[in-house]
Amino acid sequence: MEESMTNGTKVQKRNGNVEPLNLDKIHKMVEEACEGLAGVSASQVEIQSGIQFYDGITTGEIQEILVRSASDLIDLDSPNYQFVAARLLLFGLYKQVFGADWNKGFPHVQEHLVLGAHRGIYDNDLADKYSDEEWDKIDSWIDHGRDMLFTYAGLRQVVDKYLVQDRSSGELYETPQYMYMLISATIFANYPKAVSYTHLTLPTICSV
C-alpha cells in the first residue's frame, strides 16, 4: 500500500463523516491482527487484499475486504490466518458496536443492557432482575479477551447467526461476550442466588 494512493482520497466512516484516507491506520490494524501469531504476515494480507481505493469508499468496505483477504490465505501451511481474519472481523464488530474509541475500554454490562433496552433490542425487565451489586459481579466475570480465541469460521457463525442485529441493515448491537452473559442472565433471572452460585459464568467459560 503506497502512500501515493492516499492522494485526495476520502473515506466515509460508519457515522457518516468523511475524512482523508489514512493508510497508516489500516496498516496498524492489520499488524495488530497478526500480533503474536506465527507464520502470518501483515504485508501479505494487505497485498492479497488488492484494495482499489476510491472517493467515498466506506471503512466498513475496507474492513470486509481485509477480512476476506486474510481468510483467503488460510491453508494447511498457514492455519493462523484463521485468527487474523477473525480478529479483523472482530475489530470491525467492535467499531460498529462501540464506535472508533472501542479500544479505550468496554462499557459495564449493565450500562450496555440499559442502553440496549432503551433502543428496543433487550428486554426492559432484565436489568431489574439483579441488583447493582450483582451486575457488578456479573461484569467482573466478562473477559472480552476471550473473543480473540475465536477462529474465523467460529466468529463468522456467531456474527451472522446469533448476535442481536438489524437484519435489514446488518447493524450489530452486541459482542460475543455480552451475548453469552446476557443469555445466561436471562436464563437464570428467576433462579435464587444465581449470581452467588456462579451459574452465569458457565457460558463465558465455554464461549469458544
Go through each PLM region and give its residues.
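Extended catalytic cores of very large enzyme megasubunits
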Residues: M1-L200
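Single conserved hydrophobic/aromatic residue that forms the stacking wall/gate
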Residues: H199-V208
